[in-house]
Amino acid sequence: MQDTAHEQIRKETWSDPWSRDWFIIEQLVSRDFKLKFRRSFLGVLWSVLNPLLMMVVMAIVFTAMLRFSSSSIPSFPLYIILGNITFTLMADSTTYGMHSIIDNASLIKKVRINRFVFPIEKVLFALVNFSFSLIAVAFVMIFVGIAPTGFALLLPLFIVYVGTFCVGLSFLLSAAVVFFRDIMHLWTIVLTVWTYATPLFYSEEILPSWFRNLETFNPMYHYVNFIREILLYGRMPSLELNFACIVCSLISLALGWFVFSRHEKRFILFI
């Protein structure tokens, strides 16, 4: 008996491992998106409102209360929100990704599936939320009177840079936390320290020279600068900045994939 059209499509799709993995990733992203905003009155609007509200709070604290100002920053609110959404993208990606293997333990035990899809899916889910945050950025740009330039078209390149970096970190953390659960608590502390070590809510001009030199080794410093260059300052990121972003992304991906692929066969024994 001939296969039905539905069965034929299913066979053709699942005969290709990459198509199968991508299908699984799509389904997981859809599931997480629905779960996040389930029973929420404003739903996806929170992805727009949250960075806006955070920007307002930080702008008040650093300008009105701490009297911070810098002539080199065209718009402090835009400066804040760009730093905030970039760091939030990394923090959410890695936190979700870190839990991705142990949270899907039952599925991994029952179904033969490539385990790398779980950390990647969490990063893609965070990127979906990030895309809604860009709506908030557009509102702020309109409010402060800064028009996007042609360099805003480099935003997809920024997403590739930071997305690759987050995938690598998620590979590393998701593998490590299978064997050492304490990493979940340590990572929260690391993110807190990392937040204040990165010029998100303050200008790097206030940092001592020795600390500014250390920022060279801070990947998020480079990614935050990249998005500010194209959306806040409206100019082409330097070759040095692009090189730093590429190096950080590739090192993260290589290290994360090495650790993940080397230990993934043992996950089933510890989850």
Regions found by a protein language model. Name each.
Residues M1-I271:
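Hydrophobic transmembrane alpha-helices and immediately adjacent juxtamembrane helices
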